Amino acid sequence: MLRSALLAAACLLCVSAHAETVKFSATMGPDTEVPPKAAPGAAGTATATLDTETRHLDYDASWNGLTGPATMAHFHGPAAPGKNAGVQVKIGDPNPTSPTTGSATLTEEQVAQLTAGQWYANVHTAANPGGEIRGQLTKQ
């Protein structure tokens, strides 16, 4: 009985030792959009924290100087810098305001993409519906 309890405790320690919290950040600007946008003064940041065991992602994003109100904001992927990709996670509601926070539970595939540096944050406006500012998420 004691041996089984010790074995179970050891297994829990092994699982806990593999769990990790990973932080990401992105600096968004119009020059990193694909193609680049003419939006002088538009800028933003996005940060995220991922629990690799639960696949839970907490994020926050802020922006300023856009050509108009944000109409949408998302994390996109998988894509290398300079490439476009589909939406993975919405940032805030439609017509999000800055700053905004939120969370999502990712799939294993999404975790692999994010940790490989294949996601970017993107804020859209009416003048730039494909995205006005963008930044690649990188591990901190």
Show the residue positions of the predicted features:
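Gram-negative bacterial Sec-dependent N-terminal signal peptides
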Residues: 1-18
